């Protein structure tokens, strides 16, 4: 099957002398891999655009037996500059892309995943100060977009809207069920994480707003710890991924 699609280059590898394999996040099809035969040499077909973080318009051809896909042509639509020159920003971006690869994205969630990732890269390209929890917040939002969204609106037991204030004893985030319990209600057996008003507001903000606005968030040390525990616990339980020794590992 032949198709044309916009895509973000997630990873590039070399095989044989002049050929490349490329992993893309496509706007319509999600994550795919394709071989770029002659990709190291062909300026006419690929114009030097097969670099990580580049957004391209690509034309792909499937083999007759469906064993692999061959990249026929690619045109550069957009590529970062500052991101490539700042190794800290580069590292944050790579961490986010590795999570995308580890979790995966199919056709159903492709458009939202594509848009979210481009907004994350634009934030890294343009913002003066990178949000310190950006990789964690991106993992949370990407998982939410792929169907793993928890419920932060109200207590899962009594149903009362929850604002996380101290008068009701704070909140507990139930990792397994992805819901909140107020201080007056008992949570079921299972791992829970304390959630303050600050952390709850931040997670709601991330869930509802573009990454381009995440630099507005400001965390206290306590808020950082709570957010990290809640997001890491949720992703480990529901997706089975943990960041270890520079890579995402399946539990």
From Swiss-Prot:
GO terms for biological process: DNA recombination; double-strand break repair. Keywords: DNA damage, DNA recombination, DNA repair. InterPro entries: ARFGAP/RecO, DNA_rep/recomb_RecO_N, NA-bd_OB-fold, RecO, RecO_C. It holds the Pfam family RecO_C. Signal peptide: none annotated. The keyword DNA repair applies. The keyword Lipid metabolism does not apply. GO terms for cellular component: bacterial nucleoid. Involved in DNA repair and RecF pathway recombination. Belongs to the RecO family. This is DNA repair protein RecO. It comes from Nitratidesulfovibrio vulgaris (strain ATCC 29579 / DSM 644 / CCUG 34227 / NCIMB 8303 / VKM B-1760 / Hildenborough) (Desulfovibrio vulgaris). The lineage of its organism: Bacteria, Pseudomonadati, Thermodesulfobacteriota, Desulfovibrionia, Desulfovibrionales.
């Amino acid at each position: 099957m032949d198709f044309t699609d916009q895509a973000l280059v997630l990873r590039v590898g070399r095989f044989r002398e002049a050929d490349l394999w490329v992993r893309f996040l496509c706007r319509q099809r999600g994550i795919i891999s394709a071989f770029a035969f002659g990709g190291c040499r062909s300026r006419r077909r690929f114009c030097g655009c097969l670099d990580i973080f580049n957004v391209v318009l690509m034309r792909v051809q499937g083999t007759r037996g469906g064993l692999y896909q061959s990249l026929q042509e690619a045109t550069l639509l957009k590529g970062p500059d500052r991101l490539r020159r700042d190794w800290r920003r580069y590292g944050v971006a790579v961490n986010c892309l590795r999570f995308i690869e580890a979790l995966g994205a199919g056709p159903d969630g492709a458009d939202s995943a594509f848009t979210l990732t481009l907004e994350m890269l634009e934030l890294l390209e343009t913002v003066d100060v990178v949000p310190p929890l950006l990789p964690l917040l991106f993992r949370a939002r990407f998982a939410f977009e792929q169907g793993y969204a928890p419920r932060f609106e109200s207590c899962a037991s009594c149903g009362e809207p929850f604002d996380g204030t101290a008068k009701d004893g704070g909140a507990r985030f139930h990792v397994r069920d992805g819901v909140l319990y107020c201080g007056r209600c008992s949570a079921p057996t299972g791992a829970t994480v304390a959630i303050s008003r600050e952390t709850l507001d931040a997670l709601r903000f991330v869930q509802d707003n573009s990454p381009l606005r995440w630099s507005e968030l400001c965390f206290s040390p306590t808020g950082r710890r709570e957010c990290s525990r809640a997001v890491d616990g949720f992703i480990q339980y529901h997706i089975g991924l943990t960041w270890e020794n520079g890579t995402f590992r399946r539990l």
